[in-house]
Amino acid sequence: MESWLFLALVLVVALVGKNMSLIIATGVVMALKLIPFASKWLPVIQAKGINWGVTVISVAILIPVATGQIGFKDLINTFKSPAGWIAILAGIAVAILSRYGVDQLAAVPQVTVALVLGTIIGVVVFKGVAAGPVIASGMTYLVITLFNLHF
């Protein structure tokens, strides 16, 4: 019963904050809880969901390459600007930090509660986005803005 109340609270917060991603995610989880045999799938989704999400985001990021909007010229130009190097370094830093984050979640599962709360607050109150790889872009944006750099 407690899980239903928690999910209902998250749904209400998502509705108040008008965050469609969180509304859909909460609705999907609640629907899965209603399906009797789906409880076997919840641990699988919990264990693999982040990787699936990263894969979907990676596909979206690669679409401009597939459509020809981004090519080798753009890749080469990346190495010619400070902003490009910052983006590369931010991507590396996030990948390294994420490895340690995954290790910490496995070692200290209680961190998950704080992460869920922080993510909900960040998404709903501050109109943030709950996505890992996008953090690298956000860090890049911050540094580029602070130093008034351009690609």
From Swiss-Prot:
One GO location term (cellular component): plasma membrane
Keyword Flavoprotein: no
Transmembrane segments: 4-24, 25-45, 52-72, 78-98, 115-135
Signal sequence coordinates: none
Cellular location(s): Cell membrane
Keyword vocabulary terms for this entry: Cell membrane, Membrane, Transmembrane, Transmembrane helix
UniProt topology in membrane: Multi-pass membrane protein
Superkingdom, natural source: Bacteria
Family under the similarity heading: Belongs to the UPF0756 family.
Protein name: UPF0756 membrane protein lhv_0995
Species of origin: Lactobacillus helveticus (strain DPC 4571)
